[in-house]
Amino acid sequence: MPRSDYLFTSESVSEGHPDKVSDRISDTVVDAYLSAMPEARLGVETLTTTNRVVIAGEVRGPDSVTFKDLEELTREAVRDIGYEQSGFHWKNNDVAIHLHAQSADIAQGVDAAGNKDEGAGDQGIMFGYAADETPALMPAPIFYAHKILKDLADARKAKQGDAAKLGPDAKSQVTVRYANGRPVEVTQIVLSTQHLDESLDSADVRAIVEPYILKALPQGWVNEGTVWHVNPTGKFVIGGPDGDAGLTGRKIIVDTYGGAAPHGGGAFSGKDPTKVDRSAAYAARYLAKNVVAAGLARRATIQLSYAIGVAKPLSIYVDLHGTGTVDEAKLETVLMDALDLSPRGIRTALQLNKPIYARTSAYGHFGREPDADGGFSWEKTDLADKLKSAF
């Protein structure tokens, strides 16, 4: 029987965290190619370190996207994040690009030909999850860990008062107490943020960030018993890739459910939507969210599996964690009928062949508001009525 009274913790990192800088650049490259050719194929990895950005990977796309274009887009991305420090500056960084053609062996397994449908870009397992703990149907700890950092970043960029003294690199961690299976309060808050003014100490930084944190969290969740840890090392001036090297794809739990659900292991950023690591994880979230939105369960975990070159998923698994009102085995069949889970079917249904990925690279791929141009389409609940009517 699942526990109903417990503590659960999730962390988030800001767009200025070195790994997130790398994710942003990789997805900026993806967007550049998809803008020029919606069927472009990419697998792009980025290394960021002191005064240097290295982009490497495989591409099948138009020659109209030049390395000079990508260098300019990289500098724009770093500038938007906010890095203008001596060890990592958008204008002065060395940008090295090492992209080459996609392997023909991989392409032949993925490409549609004759009567063969487009196959998955790789084997793997992907998970989707939803819970009725927040308006976005996300687990509360990761949802609010993201919100804290996003609100602080928005204030920093808008130069709102003393928030302008903060730097781009930051991390948050939120511990939530559950009673009777529902989130009721925050017991621990951890916030480490870079600050540009070297004279600031932990108390000064807390005075800056506390109002934003309190506003981000539900009223009453923070009380006299909540323990705060703000810049516990005391000083955080050197941040971002100048402090630690960053790599694409190293924050996969931050990107998803904060540890509240299983993870198949595949990262998202730098991959075009033929890569099921990305597109099938989005589809699994879409299905799980619509199951919960339809009132069929309070919590839902969905697993999908694929083989390279094979169009249809090898399996689907549903776990409603004892909160469901319907039979899980029947729901598996209903979900397979409700959405074409082939790579092409997912891309078509969710309109994934668009330049919509740079915006996903920080503050979570899930629990976001769908955009008018198709971004975060997997967060829509337009399948809920169809699922409800199947029972």
Swiss-Prot record:
BP term (GO), one: S-adenosylmethionine biosynthetic process
Residues involved in K(+) binding: 45
Region (Flexible loop): 102-112
Localization per Swiss-Prot or TrEMBL: Cytoplasm
Any one Gene Ontology molecular-function term assigned to this protein's record: ATP binding
Enzyme class: transferase
Binding site for ATP: 17, 169-171, 235-236, 244, 250-251, 267, 271
Broad class of where this protein is predominantly found: cytoplasm
Gene3D superfamilies: 3.30.300.10
Disulfide-bonded cysteines: none
EC numbers for this chain: 2.5.1.6
InterPro entries for the chain: ADOMET_SYNTHASE_CS, S-AdoMet_synt_C, S-AdoMet_synt_central, S-AdoMet_synt_N, S-AdoMet_synthetase, S-AdoMet_synthetase_sfam
Domain of life from the UniProt record: Bacteria
UniProt remark on cofactor binding: Binds 2 divalent ions per subunit. Binds 1 potassium ion per subunit.
Keywords linked to the UniProt accession: ATP-binding, Cytoplasm, Magnesium, Metal-binding, Nucleotide-binding, One-carbon metabolism, Potassium, Transferase
Pathway the protein acts in: Amino-acid biosynthesis; S-adenosyl-L-methionine biosynthesis; S-adenosyl-L-methionine from L-methionine: step 1/1
Region (Disordered), start-end ranges: 1-20
Residues binding L-methionine: 58, 102, 244, 275
Keyword check for Nucleotide-binding: yes
Cofactor: Mg(2+); K(+)
Catalyzed chemical reaction(s): L-methionine + ATP + H2O = S-adenosyl-L-methionine + phosphate + diphosphate
HAMAP family tied to this protein: S_AdoMet_synth1
Function: Catalyzes the formation of S-adenosylmethionine (AdoMet) from methionine and ATP. The overall synthetic reaction is composed of two sequential steps, AdoMet formation and the subsequent tripolyphosphate hydrolysis which occurs prior to release of AdoMet from the enzyme.
Subunit architecture: Homotetramer; dimer of dimers.
Family assignment from sequence similarity: Belongs to the AdoMet synthase family.
Name of this protein: S-adenosylmethionine synthase
